Swiss-Prot record:
GO molecular function list: magnesium ion binding; phosphoenolpyruvate carboxylase activity
Entries under NCBIfam families matching the protein: PRK00009.1
Organism field: Vibrio vulnificus (strain CMCP6)
Record lineage: Bacteria, Pseudomonadati, Pseudomonadota, Gammaproteobacteria, Vibrionales
Domain of life of the source: Bacteria
Protein name: Phosphoenolpyruvate carboxylase
Catalytic activity: oxaloacetate + phosphate = phosphoenolpyruvate + hydrogencarbonate
Gene Ontology cellular-component annotations: cytosol
PROSITE patterns tied to this protein: PEPCASE_1 (PS00781), PEPCASE_2 (PS00393)
Length: 877
């Protein structure tokens, strides 16, 4: 490690030493010595010592079954501790200047000033700032809630140890606490033994809100308010809500039979219970603080004329409201059929009395008190509402069509699924305009159809505040959207929900503009949506379908076309980005990704999925979450106030060529290579992943299908485990080399310099290339694949090396990620610890496949390696 990372190096070393002590106490010297031997051999092998690479392989092969789990756990834990140390380093006092970049908002304000942007325009853009982060479950996030809480506490210890004025006693006490936490982590199950239920996943999401976001939101808004006062001489409006949250956990039923209407109902109840619980803690804190006696007439009226401490009197009323709400929701969660509703139903019930207290304190000369904890609670009320997070519902388009098909057959008017698109639209618009009900009372629908209708009834029974959007996956046509509106209407839904088509495949992205245009041509629909349309752009399935380069261009194209349609039609458009943590699923550093979008595509704000493992890395600690909010806010403001250039026509023309060539190259392997599927199944842990309890959702949409039916997550995840990361690069470098050979190098270099969309693509590829490891991939092949399949693996690795040269050539760089030394260092730091896990995993796969039966010990060791590699690879799961 370079000395410029001295503080990080010191923390990593200390945590490693404490982990070593724990391992020694738990397992004795033999295991610790094995771990140390493997670590040293790995370090030497990374430095190019081939003899030590061979020794490392032999050392791992010689491990008896009973030693595999503790050795794997050692490297797994070390990677988790390294992640904590690195995450902490980005917010620590000793953070290196080039790691902790200057404050994103202040940097932006300076840039806006230099570019002569009017401050009134800036103030308006900030008032319109709208960041909605949608928390989604993720099978690769197998870190249990228990472990996450310990990780937060370890972070707190690192923060204390950084204080220079600690006494010997305080330092010793903190170090002891750190050692205890590491020991607790070691002796706890790091991995779930059973597949999590959708309810478990929802609780995981609530834990993130409680442990981090609850504190981070008011902190971020307080900081933003101060920056605005400095730059614009006006603060943030008190009711501003620039950041808010939705969730898919318990609402995403696409291909997940375990998310039923009853699960959704329970998650909605739990969400409200958790919100009431957190507000209750805030209110109790405020009761102890607001002991003042002086107040205005409004507060006197609310508190009662005889109350000596009026603020406390109002807060005690809120305490009763929240306690009663918790009690009733608790009873409902536990299955009691209560006719009574929970008393807390709307945001106004919290906001109005708290805001009255705030205004009174300010009017009575106590602004300093008003701007403290009370303001934080008011900010939370706006951000989290009474539901904590709004729930999205997601369902696959054919499930809605099947409801209508079964219904039309019952009514004797034909089979909806066999009708033309024109006939479907005519039927749907007629029924939407009709005042009579469509569903017959005596109709007994099949179980699957009943489930869809029951979900719609759950939506109808809740307030609008409870929900974000109804997302239609695999949306292809205008009728897919109209069908959901009709089913919601027939279920008695009293409000208009955002019905959001998700365009996922290459063809669907290319067709998105036509679908939205068709919807806008229907007057009835225009009335329904009240001038606002949300559209979701699918990143993962489009990349799985066509490769990252073609998918990236199709996404850009679709966004650009949709923005134009919205402008022509005079509607507000919100683009919802279904990005994952990985490059193959659209992941990129947030700031760069947002600035690489088409001009005007962020006018309607940002709505983006944050998934499992990325939630922890970007939002898992309050200070880290504040940094993430700052990055999002500055990128959106910059994109709207200093929009990126419109791409030149010759850039577009070349992107069309790159897209076509890369798609053909990608599909020629994934679809056209006869050995590809057997190679994929043998050289990666794909088959084993499907059997492990990694998430509530099955790995395949269709249990009998091949690669095309695999979900995007296991598809990417399998390749990231064996370090070939194939979906994240295949086709892209080949297309770039093709264009160089055709004489377009100068144009490619210009695009790289001047077009954020293109330079971000190449930057993402560089990061992937640095995380790939051809030697490890070859080792998996040699240990696990039939000899007849080895030439395919060699060809793919040769292609990888050629692609790296092509990208570096266009960027005029000698080394990967040379413009991001911190990113480079971060990846290198982990490699020493990931490689032993890779070799252990290959060995475990070999032993389990040879035996044909997986013993409990081997299965646990395998899961530990999977979790460890995921932790080490960071955004490649």
């Amino acid at each position: 490690m370079n000395e410029k990372y001295a503080a990080l190096k010191s923390n990593v070393s200390m945590l490693g030493h404490l982990l070593g002590n724990t391992i020694q106490e738990a397992h004795g010297d033999e295991i610790l010595e094995k771990v140390e031997t493997i670590r040293k051999l790995s370090k030497s092998a990374r430095a190019g010592n081939q003899a030590d690479r061979n020794n490392l392989i032999e050392e791992i092969k010689s491990l008896p079954d009973e030693q595999l789990t503790p050795v794997a756990r050692a490297f797994n834990q070390f990677l988790n501790l390294t992640n904590i140390a690195e995450q902490y380093h980005t917010i620590s006092r000793h953070c290196d200047a080039h790691v902790c970049e200057p404050d994103a908002i202040n940097t932006l304000f300076a840039k806006l000033g230099q570019n002569g942007i009017n401050k009134l325009d800036t103030a308006q853009a900030i008032r319109e700032l709208n960041i909605e982060l949608v928390l989604t479950a993720h099978p690769t996030e197998i870190t249990r809630r228990t472990m996450i809480n310990k990780l937060v506490k370890i972070n707190e210890c690192l923060s204390k140890l950084e204080l220079s004025d600690l006494s010997y006693k305080e330092r010793h006490k903190t170090e002891k606490r750190l050692e205890q936490l590491i020991a607790q982590s070691w002796h706890s199950d790091v991995i779930r033994k059973q597949r999590p239920t959708p309810l478990d996943e929802a609780k995981w999401g609530f834990a993130v809100v409680e442990n981090s976001l609850w504190e981070a939101v008011p902190d971020f808004l307080r900081e933003l308010d101060e920056k605005l006062k400095d730059y614009l001489d006006q603060g943030l409006p008190i009711d501003a809500r620039p950041v808010h949250f939705s969730s898919w956990m318990g609402g995403d039923r696409d291909g997940n039979p375990f998310v039923t209407h009853t699960v959704t109902r329970e998650v909605l109840l739990l969400s409200r219970w958790k919100a009431a619980d957190l507000y209750l803690k805030d209110i109790n804190e405020l009761i102890s603080e607001l002991s003042m006696t002086k107040c205005n007439d409004t507060v006197r009226q609310l508190a009662g004329e005889d109350e000596h401490e009026p603020y406390r009197a109002i807060l005690k009323q809120l305490r009763t409201l929240l306690s009663d709400t918790k009690e009733i929701l608790d009873a409902k969660i536990n299955g009691q059929k209560l006719a009574v509703k929970a008393p807390l139903q709307s945001v106004e019930q919290l906001w109005d009395p708290l805001f009255a207290c705030y205004q009174s304190l300010r009017e009575c000369g106590m602004s300093m008190i008003a701007e403290g904890s009370l303001l934080d609670t008011l900010r939370r009320v706006k951000a989290f509402g009474v539901h904590l997070v709004r729930l999205d519902i997601r369902q696959e388009s054919t499930r809605h069509a099947d409801v209508l098909s079964e219904l039309t057959r019952y009514l004797g008017i034909g089979d909806y699924n066999h009708w033309s698109e024109q006939d479907k639209i005519a039927f749907l618009t007629n029924e939407l305009a009709s005042k009579r009900p469509l569903l017959p009372r005596d109709w007994q629908p099949s179980e699957q159809v009943k489930e869809v209708l029951d979900t719609c009834k759950i939506i109808a029974a809740q307030s609008r505040e409870a929900f974000g959007a109804y997302v239609i996956s695999m949306a292809k046509t205008a009728s897919d959207v109209l069908a959901v509106h009709l089913l919601l209407q027939e279920s008695g839904c009293p409000y208009r929900m955002d019905v959001c088509p998700l365009f996922e495949t290459l063809d669907d992205l290319n067709n998105a503009e036509a679908v939205i245009k068709q919807l806008m041509s229907i007057d009835l629909y225009r009335g329904f949506i009240q001038n606002h349309q949300m559209v979701m752009i699918g990143y993962s399935d489009s990349a799985k379908d066509a490769g990252v380069m073609a998918a990236g261009w199709a996404q850009y194209h679709a966004m650009e076309a949709l923005v134009n349609v919205a402008e022509q039609e005079g509607i507000e458009l919100t683009l919802f980005h279904g990005r994952g943590g990985t490059i193959g699923r659209g992941g990129a550093p947030a700031h760069a990704a947002l600035l690489s979008q088409p001009p005007k595509s962020l006018k309607g704000g940002l709505r983006v999925t944050e998934q499992g493992e990325m939630i922890r890395f970007k939002l898992g600690l309050p200070d880290v979450a504040v940094n993430s909010f700052n990055m999002y806010a500055s990128a959106i403001l910059e994109a709207n106030l200093l929009p990126p250039p419109e791409p030149k026509q010759e850039w577009r023309d070349l992107m069309e060529v790159l897209s076509q060539v890369s798609c053909e190259a990608y599909r020629s392997v994934v679809r056209g290579e006869p050995d590809f599927v057997p190679y994929f199944r043998q050289a990666t842990p794909e088959l084993e992943l499907g059997k492990l309890p990694l998430g509530s959702r099955p790995a395949k949409r269709n249990p009998n299908g091949g690669v095309e039916s695999l979900r995007a997550i296991p598809w990417i995840f399998s390749w990231s485990q064996n370090r070939l990361l194939l979906p994240a690069w295949l086709g892209a470098g080949e297309a770039i080399q093709y264009s160089i050979d055709k004489g377009h190098q100068a144009l490619l270099e210009e695009m790289c310099r001047e077009w954020p969309f293109f330079s971000t693509r190449l930057g993402m590829l560089e990061m992937v290339y640095l995380k790939c490891n051809s030697e490890i991939s070859r080792y998996y092949d040699e240990r696990l694949a039939d000899k007849s399949l080895l030439p395919l693996g060699d060809r793919l690795r040769d292609q990888l090396q050629s692609d790296i040269k092509a990208v570096l050539n266009v960027e005029n760089n000698e080394n990967l990620m040379q413009s991001d030394p911190w990113g480079q260092e971060s990846i290198r730091l982990r490699n020493i610890y990931i490689e032993p896990l890779n070799m252990l995993q290959a060995e475990l796969l070999y032993r389990t496949r040879q035996a044909g039966v997986v013993s409990e010990a081997l299965e646990e060791a395998l899961m530990v390696t999977i979790a460890g590699i995921a932790a080490g690879m960071r955004n490649t799961g």
